[in-house]
């Protein structure tokens, strides 16, 4: 018998809270590029249910890893707390707060707050889950339609696979998917949600991902780094950090290109092809 998401989730809720009638639970899907998340309430409890799916696995999502990471970060105060891990389902607290708009996200005053929580995260000891970037890219490469792998792209891929990666400044935890939709301003301060891609990386790689993923201008990047490097938990040498971010930037672009290509391959949704297009152009891949 193939259970629908709601039926499978209801069974998990029934086992965890047997005294609550199944009809009392309200479940609705939450939006997101990788999907698989649901809002859950019985009128008293409020939770987020995040399911492990095969599709998410092709993008590197692992709910067991996410569960362990969130437990390790529970005292940092910038992430939702874990309620339970049951089978393929990760149940998290529902964070109430105000969504961060794209306009607010780019303001210097907000960048100051964001720089502080990123610096605090980078100050935490490694989580024990290092990003194996070349391994990830190799796996994603195998998911792409061979008809798209033209000679220029084959040469580019070989270049990245044989190139030496930049020497890390400092390996630290990173969220890896910071953008307005994954930020909430709560009564306890700024919080990050959706930690499914969290891993240990060089702080230069983490910041290059933040900057490139949000298309920040040079001024916005400089503003953020000025704040980041003034915090005790940040990195003191801004010049060295800027150099390292630049070294990582092409690797970040290639990582993003592979992610969008796999998403397009799996869903055929135009948004992923559109997101991949400027990245293809940046590598002179004309298709």
Q: Whereabouts are the PLM-identified features?
A:
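All-alpha amphipathic helical-bundle segments outside canonical DNA-binding/catalytic cores
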Residues: 235-249
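Glycine-rich, phosphate-binding/catalytic loops in enzymes
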Residues: 66, 108-109, 191, 208-211, ...
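An alpha-helical support segment within catalytic cores of ATP-dependent transferases
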Residues: 5-21, 126-176, 186, 237, ...
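ATP/Mg2+ or Mg2+-diphosphate-binding catalytic cores
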Residues: 258-287
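Conserved N-terminal boundary motif of the eukaryotic protein kinase catalytic domain
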Residues: 21-28
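Active-site acidic catalytic loop and adjacent metal/ATP-binding pocket
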Residues: 34-43, 47-49, 161-205, 219
């Amino acid at each position: 018998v193939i259970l629908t998401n709601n039926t499978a989730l209801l069974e998990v809720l029934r086992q965890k809270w047997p005294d609550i009638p199944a009809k009392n639970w309200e479940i609705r899907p939450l939006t997101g590029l990788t999907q698989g998340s649901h809002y859950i309430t019985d009128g008293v409890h409020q939770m987020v249910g995040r399911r492990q799916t095969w599709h998410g696995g092709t993008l590197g999502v692992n709910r067991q890893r996410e569960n362990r990471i969130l437990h390790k970060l529970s005292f940092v105060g910038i992430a939702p707390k874990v309620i339970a891990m049951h089978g393929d389902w990760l149940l998290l607290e529902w964070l109430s707060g105000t969504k961060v708009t794209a306009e607010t996200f780019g303001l210097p005053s907000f960048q100051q707050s964001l720089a502080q929580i990123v610096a605090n995260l980078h100050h935490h000891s490694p989580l024990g889950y290092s990003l194996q970037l070349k391994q990830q890219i190799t796996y994603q490469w195998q998911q792409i339609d061979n008809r798209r792998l033209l000679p220029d792209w084959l040469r580019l891929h070989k270049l990245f696979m044989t190139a030496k990666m930049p020497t890390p400044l400092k390996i630290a935890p990173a969220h890896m998917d910071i953008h307005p939709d994954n930020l909430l301003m709560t009564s306890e301060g700024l919080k990050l949600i959706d930690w499914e891609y969290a891993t240990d990386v060089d702080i230069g790689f983490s910041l290059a991902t933040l900057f490139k993923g949000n298309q920040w201008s040079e001024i916005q990047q400089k503003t953020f780094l000025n704040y980041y490097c003034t915090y005790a938990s940040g990195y003191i040498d801004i010049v060295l950090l800027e150099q390292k971010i630049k070294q990582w930037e092409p690797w970040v672009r290639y990582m993003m290109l592979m992610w969008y290509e796999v998403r397009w391959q799996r869903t055929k949704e135009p948004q992923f092809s559109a997101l991949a297009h400027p990245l293809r152009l940046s590598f002179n891949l004309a298709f």
